[in-house]
Amino acid sequence: MKLSGGVEWALHCCVVLTTATEPVPAARLALLHDVSPSYLAKQMQALSRAGLVASVQGKTGGYALTRPAAEITVLDVVQAVDGAGPAFVCTEIRQRGPLGTPPQECTKPCGVARVMYAADSAWRASLRSVTIADLVDSVEQDNGPTALPAIGAWLNPAGSGS
């Protein structure tokens, strides 16, 4: 399974948006993470299309989470950025070639497909079981209780409007 880099960026943005008191422009999120503003903007647009963040227009505009962090799963973010399609798509290779199995004998998925479908299901269940709130907790455990408040203050400096 290979996820795009945008998934990592989007997850980090969702975590830090939990600290913001006002909408945060994508450019400010990109500056915080030292990443490409245009590429990050695409990830934020994907989150917005999925309804995970709201895009607020105007001088004090930016992005904000649309619901509590405990209600947004890692799977929600992965699917918003990389799509909801399956990780494995069976192409029935067993039916090809000079010794291929006749299609009428292929009435159920083969062992390869079954194990891949099971792995995809387990992977999705694992990502579904972790929320942005859980990731916030992990940041606090890994970096201490002042890390996220400091980020929140940097994202929304008092009186700046952004």
What are these regions (language model features)?
Residues 3-7, 11-35, 54:
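N-terminal helix-turn-helix DNA-binding core of bacterial DNA-binding proteins
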Residues 38:
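Key DNA-contact positions within bacterial/archaeal DNA-binding proteins
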Residues 31, 48-49:
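Alpha-helical residues within the helix-turn-helix
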Residues 90-162:
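C-terminal regulatory/oligomerization modules of transcriptional regulators
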Residues 51-66:
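Beta-hairpin "wing" of winged helix-turn-helix
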Residues 14, 44-45:
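Short, hydrophobic-biased segments on the C-terminal half of alpha helices
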